């Protein structure tokens, strides 16, 4: 099977890269093993929140310039500050065109409220997520009886520190009793599958209405809206106060919705989606990828002109930690890591951990190397890259989006518009 590009990994980076390549008329296939990290994320994307020295980023242009000095191996430094800003704008437009209507601006980050009621700087977030400053003084944080993935009292306690009047309440929906037999089934995603049924909408409205009459804003867990935000908009039109939603513990409804929208758009535009499959081997001859072998296709290789590695970090098994080092399991690519195992971590759990910055090494075009030799038609994108800390620096989603479009640009230029 011949393709212009085979993308190994179906997360945020892989999907955005595929969508961008489709705009240039290239035939793409995505091989994905299972659920991506998006399913376990908040659905919000960070661009750059904090510099390596701990300074918060308030001006993205100045932040990128400072990052170049402090983190010379960061993917943003590799790509270049001006290109990062341009590609971030393109990524935002691509998300919008795919049906993911997110709020935010490249030049100015905003503060979103987290599930614990704290504030976190972010680039893009779902419109139902509350953004600081809140347009209300009297707030009620509402939980659902029996849902352990959201603690209303913790969120309320944090919000009270900002001199707001915050109360808590709990609603009981007997229609959800079918899920209560097994506590592991009483999760936000399973609740959403029931509540997204239009016949159930009035039941949720009736449960929230008495609370809505006593406050200016309701904040509750994001336990509906797997396909779209129709129910959220419907409730906001009918309740006497505004309604905002906070992501729960994983799996996350906003994260799943974002992934599903991108995946459906990729398939709608003619992309080949290979779910439940896994790349087992990549044939590389004279520094060029010629064949990609997957578990399900056995002795039938995929033959791409270009290949993209978007396999994720440790969470997605794109990187594997062993006693003597970190390795990239598909091809054994060169990995940026510390010399000894003792340097992998800091003893304080809440400190920035060095292992978070481990990943494959690349050139300026994001082409990785194998035994010191650059692989000419292979590009690495997303969390598999080294040189950045997605948690401490608040740049995980941004690196995925920007690196995906940077690689897609180089592939499109090399392909020359020829399929």
From Swiss-Prot:
Write the Enzyme Commission number(s) for this entry: 1.1.5.3
Keyword Oxidoreductase (UniProt): yes
* One of the GO biological process terms: glycerol-3-phosphate catabolic process
- What sort of enzyme, by top EC class, is this? oxidoreductase
Task: List all membrane-crossing ranges.
Answer: none
Q: Give the keywords, sorted.
A: Flavoprotein, FMN, Oxidoreductase
- Pathway it belongs to? Polyol metabolism; glycerol degradation via glycerol kinase pathway; glycerone phosphate from sn-glycerol 3-phosphate (anaerobic route): step 1/1
Needs which cofactor?
Answer: FMN
Q: Which reaction does it catalyse?
A: a quinone + sn-glycerol 3-phosphate = dihydroxyacetone phosphate + a quinol
> InterPro entries under this entry?
FAD-dep_OxRdtase_2_FAD-bd (IPR003953), FAD-oxidoreductase_2 (IPR050315), FAD/NAD-bd_sf (IPR036188), G3P_DH_GlpB_su (IPR009158)
What is a single molecular function from GO for this protein? Answer: glycerol-3-phosphate dehydrogenase (quinone) activity
Give one Pfam family, short name only: FAD_binding_2
What GO cellular component is one of the record's annotations? glycerol-3-phosphate dehydrogenase (FAD) complex
Q: What superkingdom does the record give?
A: Bacteria
Purpose: Conversion of glycerol 3-phosphate to dihydroxyacetone. Uses fumarate or nitrate as electron acceptor.
Q: Which family does the record claim for this protein?
A: Belongs to the anaerobic G-3-P dehydrogenase subunit B family.
Sorted alphabetically, which NCBIfam families does this protein's record hold?
glycerol3P_GlpB, PRK05329.1-1, PRK05329.1-2, PRK05329.1-3
- Quaternary arrangement and interactors, per the entry? Composed of a catalytic GlpA/B dimer and of membrane bound GlpC.
Task: Identify this protein by name.
Answer: Anaerobic glycerol-3-phosphate dehydrogenase subunit B
